[in-house]
Structures are given as structure tokens and as C-alpha cells.
């Protein structure tokens, strides 16, 4: 575990780390808005059928000139069960008799209606345009709206596995830059998509890379920081998600047409992809993949940025080889995903991490649906949601400084489950308490996720860190799909879905204790480090590393 010694020589928390985390903060903040875009770009505004009396401005007549808009609407559009104008049907012929006696004139038959064969008219008070208004994704086509987000999440699921392995094989920096560029190109092209199918394809391509931008930011920040400070960078990047949520709410409030909003959050990614070329590749990854010369150059560059001029003389290839001799010997053996599956301890850790990620994602998505009761303004909801998660993630940062990872996660997960289960059996009249509990649940599950990210990265070896992060992302996406499916259980009991939402985090909180504790411990670099790891072996390795350093 000698890399932390090298990092101390180059600077474990200096100018380089601050600039790196600041860059990741900005990129993650902008990238996270792309995940939530459909909240606004695919919003369904109020709508009704297009009818000649109201919407054909070339038509004029005594009746249409004299009568009010409400009266013309009454004779053209039938009412639904809530006595509101139907959104998907219109009268074949104007029903003038409905204007008399409050619409109760004698009628032997119900007036004939038809679908909106001439299209729809949309309410533009909240959104001047969305993809729904562009391609008329309403009424019998409304199910197509969910296809966009489903394809985006499917892309995230596939991309997590694909780019995770590519990152472990070809490097964090190259994949990070590529993912930024692909997301920028795909979502910019989506604006100019001529058809809905083409738009979906581009959103799928954006989904392939979006999650990996944030995953690689976590990994690079972790691998360039000593263990006792790793939680700082990860927490700050997580907080950027919350800022991104609030930023998107503000931008969507100011920009009401979908294509301008899409373009506004896509253009910065082109600039960021160019700037990302100035990033330094993970020296930890370079050394553990037997690229000793490149790893030494990266360490020297970081030392120079951190103002450690004398470190350039110390950080020689011989010094790096001496400090990392054990890891270099292990790196001589080529590894693949098969080796990961054959390692019993690491395999068990990945299984536990995957279920915990699933257990965090299910209640998170379930609570999002319930939080809509906070208000009717989607813009206010987005900002409020971001503020809640920001506060909780900052709190998690402070708690991680003083509490073990397992206890930290477990307490948060138990609190999430308790909030949901109590909320499940409260009466609908206790609206204020229900909202408070739902808000507390969102905050605690966000805090649990913050600790999970730190713990997961500290448990997995450098040679497979991106791969295992990709596997965790797959289970996160599975949780996003499972949460709405659980809501179908409401046909058996209105409480059953919410009981399930509450049980998942409690189980996750219990499973956390099956994982090793990692607070203030060196990162594992190889599969062998994980397999042979015990408290005693770690102490021995740390003592060996100390002896190596004192010899120079």
C-alpha cells in the first residue's frame, strides 16, 4: 500500500487537488442537469383538441363573434368526470343546445365525439414549448413521453458497464474527456432531431456517457487524495449534484422553451471537454497497470503544481518502484473481469454493495413521487429538492469525519426506513407531518448515498474500481425501474408499496455491517490486496511503508 507515501511527497491536498475538485464540481453540476432535463423539456402542459370555432382565426360568423371564448369552448369540447374540458376528445359538431339552461336542455342522445384529428392546442403559461408539444405526445401517444427517460436510463445502465471497464483498461482521463464530448454532441444534436425517434436515439447516446462523467470524477478525486481526506472531494462532488438541481430549476424558470434550455446546458460541456485535457491521469492507476514511467511523470507534475520543488528529485522511477514493489509484482499478472468473479472476498463485497445501492435507489425514487405534494410549482419543487439534498450531503461530510463508514450508513438507512414506514400509516389529513417526514426521508437517503460512494470506492481495488462502480450504477438504475413497478402493488393494498419502500433501506442498513470498515485506511490497489486484507495485514503493510520512507 505504498502509493500514499508517493502522494505525500507530491502533495496530498494542495493546489492541484483543489483545482481538480473545483473542475469536477463544475462539470458534475452541469452534467447532472442532463439527467433531470425531462422534468422540464418533457413536461405535459394543459391541452385540448383544436376546434375551428376557437382556433381557426380565418373563420367568422355571428355566433362566433358574439359568444365568449368560454361559451365556444363549451359547445366544442365535452366535459370530463371532473367537469373540466376533455383533453383528448371533441364534439363532431358544435353543440349549441348546451348553452341553454346551463347545458341541461333535453337531449335524447349523448353528442357524438371524436379524437383530436386536427391536433391540439397547448397552454403556454408554464412552458412555451416542450418535446410533448413538438411531437404531440399526449392522449394515446402520452406513453411515448416515458420512452425518452427509459432510453436515457437504459443508456446509463449499459454505459456504466461498458465505460467502467474501458476506464480501468485505458485510463480515467481519456474516458472522462470522451464522455464529456459525447454527452455534449449527443444532447446538442437532440435539439435538431427531425423526428421523435432520432431524438430518442441521441438521448440514449447521452445516457451512455452521462453517469460515467460523474463516476470518473469520483474515482480521480479519490485516487489523487490520501485516505483520511478522500471523503472531502467525494462530498463536494455530491453537493454539486444538489447545486445542479437548483440551477436547472432556475434555468427552466427563466427559459421556457425546451430547445434553448437543452442548448444552454449542453454548450458548456464542449468547453469543459477541452479543459479536461489539462487533467492529470491517475498515477495510482498508471503505476498499478505497470506504466511506471508515465506514473512517475504524473507524480512530478502534481508535485510541481503543488509547489513542492524538491519532490522532483525524490520522485524518481527507482523511488516509485521501491515504494510500489509489492503492487508492481501483482500487476505483472494480467487481470480481467473473470478474475474479479473468481475472487471470493471481492465478489462478496460487490454483491453487498450492489444490494445496498439498490436499497438506496428504491426509496429515493419512491419519495420523489411523494414529494410532489409539496407544491404545484415544478420549478419550486426542483430548487427545494436540491436544497434538501445539499444540506444532507454537507451533514454527511461532517459526520464522516468523526464516525465509521458502516455505522454512518446504517443510521441513515434506518432513519429513511423509519420515516417511510411512519408516513405510510399517517392519515391524509396530517399533510404537514407527511411532508416533513417525506422531506426528512429524502435528506437522509441522500446522506446515506454520500457515505456509500466513499465506502464503495475505498473497498474496491484500483485495477477494477471503475468496473465495480459501473456495476453499482447498474443496480442503481434497476432500483429506479423497480420503484414505480412496486407502486402497482397498490391494487392489493394502498400501504403495500410504501412498506416495501421502507423495508429496502432497513435491509441495506443491516447488510452494511457485512462489509469491512475502511475509515482512514489505505486504498487497495489490486485484487490480492482485497483478498488478503485484514486489520493485522494492513498494520504490517503500513509499518513496512513507513520503513521504506525513512530509508530515503
Swiss-Prot record:
Q: Which GO terms describe its biological process?
A: lipid transport; monoatomic ion transport; steroid metabolic process
Q: What is its main location?
A: membrane
Q: InterPro entries, per this entry?
A: MFS, MFS_dom, MFS_trans_sf
Protein name as catalogued: Steroid transmembrane transporter SLC22A24
Top-level taxonomic group? Eukaryota
From the UniProt record, which GO molecular function terms apply?
transmembrane transporter activity
Q: State the similarity comment.
A: Belongs to the major facilitator (TC 2.A.1) superfamily. Organic cation transporter (TC 2.A.1.19) family.
Q: Which reaction does it catalyse?
A: estrone 3-sulfate(out) + glutarate(in) = estrone 3-sulfate(in) + glutarate(out); 17beta-estradiol 17-O-(beta-D-glucuronate)(out) + glutarate(in) = 17beta-estradiol 17-O-(beta-D-glucuronate)(in) + glutarate(out); taurocholate(out) + glutarate(in) = taurocholate(in) + glutarate(out); 5alpha-androstane-3alpha,17beta-diol 3-O-(beta-D-glucuronate)(out) + glutarate(in) = 5alpha-androstane-3alpha,17beta-diol 3-O-(beta-D-glucuronate)(in) + glutarate(out)
- Subcellular location(s) per record: Cell membrane
Q: How does it sit in the membrane?
A: Multi-pass membrane protein
Purpose: Renal transmembrane organic anion/dicarboxylate exchanger that participates in the reabsorption of conjugated steroids, as well as bile acids, driven by an outward gradient of dicarboxylates such as glutarate or succinate. Transports androstanediol glucuronide (5alpha-androstane-3alpha,17beta-diol 3-O-(beta-D-glucuronate)), estrone 3-sulfate, and estradiol-17-glucuronide (17beta-estradiol 17-O-(beta-D-glucuronate)), and taurocholate.
Q: Which organism is it from?
A: Oryctolagus cuniculus (Rabbit)
Q: Quick one: which gene encodes this? A: SLC22A24
Q: Which residues form a coiled coil?
A: none
Upper lineage ranks? Eukaryota, Metazoa, Chordata, Craniata, Vertebrata
Instruction: Return the GO cellular component terms, semicolon-separated.
Output: plasma membrane
Tell me which UniProt keywords the record has, alphabetically. Cell membrane, Ion transport, Lipid metabolism, Lipid transport, Membrane, Steroid metabolism, Transmembrane, Transmembrane helix, Transport
Gene3D superfamilies noted in UniProt: MFS general substrate transporter like domains
Amino acid at each position: 500500500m505504498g502509493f500514499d507515501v508517493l502522494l505525500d511527497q507530491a502533495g496530498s491536498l494542495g493546489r492541484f487537488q483543489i483545482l481538480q475538485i473545483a473542475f469536477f464540481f463544475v462539470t458534475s453540476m452541469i452534467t447532472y442537469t442532463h439527467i433531470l432535463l425531462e422534468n422540464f423539456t418533457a413536461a405535459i402542459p394543459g391541452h385540448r383538441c383544436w376546434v375551428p370555432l376557437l382556433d381557426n382565426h380565418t373563420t367568422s360568423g355571428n355566433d362566433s363573434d358574439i359568444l365568449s371564448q368560454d361559451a365556444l369552448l363549451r359547445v366544442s369540447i365535452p366535459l370530463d368526470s371532473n367537469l373540466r374540458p376533455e383533453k383528448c376528445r371533441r364534439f363532431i359538431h358544435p353543440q349549441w343546445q348546451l348553452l341553454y339552461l346551463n347545458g341541461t336542455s333535453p337531449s335524447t342522445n349523448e353528442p357524438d365525439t371524436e379524437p383530436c384529428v386536427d391536433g391540439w392546442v397547448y397552454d403556454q403559461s408554464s412552458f412555451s414549448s416542450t418535446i410533448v408539444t413538438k411531437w404531440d405526445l399526449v392522449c394515446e401517444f402520452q406513453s411515448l413521453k416515458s420512452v425518452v427517460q427509459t432510453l436515457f436510463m437504459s443508456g446509463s445502465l449499459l454505459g456504466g458497464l461498458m465505460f467502467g471497464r474501458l476506464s480501468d483498461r485505458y485510463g480515467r482521463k481519456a474516458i472522462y474527456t470522451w464522455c464529456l464530448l459525447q454527452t455534449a454532441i449527443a444532447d446538442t444534436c437532440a435539439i435538431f432531431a427531425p423526428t421523435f425517434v432520432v431524438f430518442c436515439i441521441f438521448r440514449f447516446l447521452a445516457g451512455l456517457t452521462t453517469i460515467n462523467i460523474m463516476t470518473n470524477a469520483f474515482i480521480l478525486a479519490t485516487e489523487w487524495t490520501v485516505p483520511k481526506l478522500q471523503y472531502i472531494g467525494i462530498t463536494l462532488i455530491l453537493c454539486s449534484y444538489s447545486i445542479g438541481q437548483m440551477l436547472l430549476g432556475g434555468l427552466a424558470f427563466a427559459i421556457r422553451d425546451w430547445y434553448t434550455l437543452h442548448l444552454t446546458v449542453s454548450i458548456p460541456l464542449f468547453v469543459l471537454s477541452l479543459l479536461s485535457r489539462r487533467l492529470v491521469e491517475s498515477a495510482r492507476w498508471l503505476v498499478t497497470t505497470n506504466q511506471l514511467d508515465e506514473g512517475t511523470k504524473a507524480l512530478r507534475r502534481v508535485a510541481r503544481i503543488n509547489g513542492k520543488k524538491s519532490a522532483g528529485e525524490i520522485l524518481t522511477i527507482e523511488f516509485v518502484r521501491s515504494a510500489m514493489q509489492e503492487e508492481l509484482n501483482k500487476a505483472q499478472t494480467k487481470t480481467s473481469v473473470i478474475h474479479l468473479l473468481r475472487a471470493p472476498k471481492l465478489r462478496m463485497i460487490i454483491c453487498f454493495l450492489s444490494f445496498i445501492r439498490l436499497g438506496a435507489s428504491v426509496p429515493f425514487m419512491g419519495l420523489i413521487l411523494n414529494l410532489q405534494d409539496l407544491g404545484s410549482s415544478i420549478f419550486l419543487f426542483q430548487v427545494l429538492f436540491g436544497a434538501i439534498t445539499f444540506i444532507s450531503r454537507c451533514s454527511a461530510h461532517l459526520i464522516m469525519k468523526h464516525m465509521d463508514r458502516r455505522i454512518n450508513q446504517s443510521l441513515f438507512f434506518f432513519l429513511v426506513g423509519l420515516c417511510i414506514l411512519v408516513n405510510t400509516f399517517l392519515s391524509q389529513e396530517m399533510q404537514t407531518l407527511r411532508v416533513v417526514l417525506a422531506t426528512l426521508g429524502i435528506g437522509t437517503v441522500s446522506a446515506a448515498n454520500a457515505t456509500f460512494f466513499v465506502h464503495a470506492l475505498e473497498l474496491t481495488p484500483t485495477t477494477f474500481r471503475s468496473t465495480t462502480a459501473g456495476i453499482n450504477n447498474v443496480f442503481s438504475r434497476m432500483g429506479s425501474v423497480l420503484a414505480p413497478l412496486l407502486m402497482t402493488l397498490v391494487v392489493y393494498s394502498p400501504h403495500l408499496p410504501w412498506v416495501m419502500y421502507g423495508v429496502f433501506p432497513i435491509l441495506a442498513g443491516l447488510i452494511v455491517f457485512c462489509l469491512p470498515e475502511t475509515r482512514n485506511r489505505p486504498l487497495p490497489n489490486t485484487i490480492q490486496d482485497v483478498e488478503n486484507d485484514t486489520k493485522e495485514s494492513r498494520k504490517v503493510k503500513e509499518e513496512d511503508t513507513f520503513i521504506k520512507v525513512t530509508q530515503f
